[in-house]
Amino acid sequence: SKLKEVWLAGGCFWGVEAYMARIYGVYDVTSGYANGNKDNPTYEEVSSGKTNFAETVHVLYDPDRVSLETLLTDFFKVIDPTSQNRQGNDVGNQYRSGIYYKNEKDKIVIDKVIKKQQEKYTSKISTENLPLKNFFLAEKYHQDYLEKNPNGYCHIDFSKLSDNKVTIDVKKYPRPSNEELKAKLTAVQYSVAVENNTEKAFTNEYASNVAAGLYVDVVTGEPLFSSIDKRSEERRVG
């Protein structure tokens, strides 16, 4: 319930989806079409340029771990915000850049980030800053495209995230005593976490879990990894 969302258009959504999914605090990313003039458009209809949809990714994130300002700042690293209806080699109104929101409070942050980004350019930023009118998921084959096709087309430079390092303050996650852990954990959890034993494969309650979220240390609660990093053929991860 505490997760927030924003919709970002930055050219071909394959690369934008994969890029945003790598940011710490992002739980899920899906590709789709935003702010067009018909229901349930197909990729071919969007590509025609007649529906006014923008290829867009829906970003679901935890504001306790990454701020909207940070997300947008990282987003601006990989787009040309002064280019109209074009990103990289992709040309057409479906490839325009945009930031779309539902919460009016988010617009304050978006305005702030755009104003700061404008200082870097002599040309006026043309990135849209609009309420989300509609959003439709793209076809299944577009989801996680670069994960399924590592050598597929991408206009995004992933090295732009090289300085996005995560640090965990371990002091915030003290280890309880064994007595406390025995009272808190199940027998299997205690055996694995404290006594260094192993559990039978695929018996853990999270083995087939498909919900977006953050996996934490059962002993201390320290963050370990995001559901984005969990791989499963049956689960589409952002």
Identify the residue ranges that each predicted region occupies:
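Flexible coil/turn and secondary-structure edge motifs
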Residues: 1-236
